[in-house]
A protein has these predicted regions:
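Acidic/polar loop patches that form or flank catalytic/metal-binding clefts of enzymes
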Residues: 24, 199-206, 271, 302-307, ...
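Short coil/turn segments at secondary-structure boundaries
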Residues: 1, 23-32, 250-252, 260-264, ...
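Structural recognition of the beta-strand scaffold that forms the well-ordered cores
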Residues: 148-149, 158-160, 202-203, 236, ...
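Active-site-proximal loop and beta-strand segments within enzyme catalytic domains
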Residues: 195-234, 239-243, 251-258, 264, ...
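Short small-residue beta-strand/loop micro-motif enriched in glycine and branched aliphatics
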Residues: 168-171, 272, 415-419
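Extended, non-catalytic substrate-recognition/exosite surfaces adjacent to catalytic cores, especially
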Residues: 1-217, 221-223, 235, 278-290, ...
Length: 529
């Protein structure tokens, strides 16, 4: 098998902790039940089943409360306590994704007779063995998610966590859940633009778009902030996940071209020939999307995810090998044991190294300056993209180092909103960040390879032109020879100004916007709006 036990443990832990963090952020759902504290309370407590497959959780009954401590009895006949600081997270969950005020005492959360789930805390005073055991108030998340980690050079799946608990649900959300990726699909739209001759500095008009879709009526996509920003470099469009820029870009390039690009990465069959596909309206699995990102990470070479390296029969004979390449210099009379082995690279190229490098640079900007800032690891090169769908039903973060590609999805199995201000940057990205931080010592990344022949010019991040002396907001941009921008370059979508009825006030072109400071983006807008 390809699974690495250490990485698998990290994946399970990062996913579980991330789901629990989200769940607690949305409040306390209340006690499992209540029971009368009569002479038979212990027998009544034993009738409750502990959470399946979650060994560190126990069922307990609240026996007595004080303002600072709840005293509990457990199913194994022992007793313990929950201190206020270990339940103060439990703000009451209200309707419509709202939560109540922070509790001020234990009685604001628990009452005698409540049946609850608890988790034992480490004994910080091990020198006092008879000290009553201390617990934290807990609840099992009703949200779920998935994480998968792939070696981008081979396609080997190194870790796969298909949900919070396999005992609770055997549904594997890595391979079986088909969900809308939202803005996580955007790198392939921007790659199509690069292949069409545009650059990360090409200006795209960020302005209202109205699309008449037969059978659906008018579709009016929006940026998350509801604001518009005027002509902005393509890099900004990806870093800040600007929907209006992406739609204009897709309309300019053509959705057929975009689907053709996505098809090389195994995603074309998931996209419909409509502009909504540019914002992630088609459904994918986490494994499909992460495999596509792995092809960006590895330099633009096609890979297929694999779970098995070799298969042997009961006599030890090899009957299957996933990688059938042979090192010709390693066998025969001319084999040199001192020379490192060289395996032929037979992988199909799916992206030109130049355009792939430009895209990776832009995706690094997502982590450094954009919607994925929560995964930033100082001094460690990472690239990726957030994704959040309409009404925040799905949250994604897919990203990579030079040696590891990781995808995270979070959502309810029966889709419903994750809540206000919840999305790829706030829900999925922290899970990715924790896993990547812990996995780095095992698979450290290196700077992404730069193909020869590119020209590097420092440009102004706001207007895409070569930086002038004194410009502060700049970025070192990579260009193919002859593509360095000038003031005479066209703005994609600028001709559509005449259809807006009036010029957009320049005061709305505010770069210090909510789109930039919120770690979230919205993708597919309701077509009936």
């Amino acid at each position: 098998a390809t699974i690495d036990p250490k990485l698998q443990h990290m994946a399970d832990t990062a996913l579980a902790d991330g789901l629990e963090t989200y769940d607690r952020r949305h409040g306390w759902r209340g006690a499992i039940s209540t029971l009368p504290l009569d002479d038979n309370w212990f027998d009544s407590l034993k009738k409750y089943k502990p959470p399946l497959g979650i060994l560190d959780r126990q069922i307990a009954a609240v026996i007595r409360t004080t303002p600072k401590v709840a005293y509990i009895g457990l199913q194994d006949g022992t007793y313990g306590s929950i201190h206020f600081e270990d339940l103060k997270w439990a703000r009451k969950r209200l309707k419509r994704q709202r939560i109540g005020p922070s509790p001020k005492s234990v009685s604001d959360v628990l009452s005698p007779g409540d049946v609850v789930t608890v988790r034992e805390l480490p004994n910080i005073q091990e020198d006092i063995p008879d000290l009553p055991r201390r617990y934290s108030l807990d609840q099992i998340p009703n949200i779920d998610g998935a994480l998968v980690a792939i070696d981008p050079h081979t396609g080997r799946v190194l870790a796969m966590s298909g949900g919070y608990s396999a005992d609770r649900s055997q549904f594997n959300r890595v391979t079986q859940a088909n969900r809308q990726p939202g803005s996580a699909i955007k790198p392939f739209i921007y790659l199509s633009a690069l292949e069409a001759g545009h650059t990360p500095a090409t200006l795209i008009l960020d302005a209202p778009v109205v699309v008449n879709i037969p059978g659906y009526g008018l579709w009016k996509p929006q940026n998350y902030s509801g604001k518009i920003y005027g002509p902005s470099p393509m890099r900004i469009g990806l870093e800040k996940s600007r929907n209006l820029m992406t739609i204009r870009l897709a309309e300019y390039i053509g959705i057929d071209k975009i689907i053709s690009t996505a098809d090389r990465f195994g995603l074309g069959q998931r996209m419909r020939p409509e502009l909504g596909s540019a914002l992630g309206s088609g459904e994918v699995t986490l494994l499909e999307l992460t495999s596509a990102y792995a092809m960006i990470a590895n330099g633009g070479l096609k890979i297929s995810p694999s779970f098995i390296d070799t298969v042997h029969d009961r006599n030890g004979n090899l009957i299957f090998r996933h990688d059938n390449r042979k090192c010709q210099e390693c066998i025969g009379p001319n084999a040199d044991p001192l020379m490192p082995p060289e395996l032929p690279n037979k992988k199909e190229r799916v992206a030109d190294p130049f355009y792939r490098y430009q895209l990776v640079s832009m995706m690094q900007g997502v982590v450094e300056n954009g919607t994925g800032r929560r995964v930033k690891l100082t001094g460690r090169p990472l690239a990726g993209k957030t994704g959040t769908t309409n009404k925040s039903l799905d949250a994604w973060f897919v990203g990579f180092s030079s040696n590891l590609t990781v995808g995270v999805f979070v959502g309810f199995d029966q889709p419903r909103t994750l809540g206000p201000r919840e999305g790829g940057g706030s829900v999925a990205a922290p899970i990715f960040g924790r896993f990547m931080r812990e996995a780095w010592p095992i698979l450290p990344g290196a700077p992404f390879k730069t193909p020869p022949g590119l020209e590097f010019v420092r440009v102004n991040r706001l207007n895409g032109l070569p930086a002038k002396q004194g410009d502060k907001n700049t970025v070192l941009e990579a260009f193919l020879p002859g593509t360095i921008p000038s003031a005479n370059d066209n703005v994609i979508g600028a001709g559509l100004y005449e259809n807006l009825g009036e010029m957009i006030p320049s005061i709305l072109f505010d770069e210090d916007s909510d789109d930039e400071v919120r770690e979230q983006d919205i993708s597919v807008q309701d077509r009936t709006n």
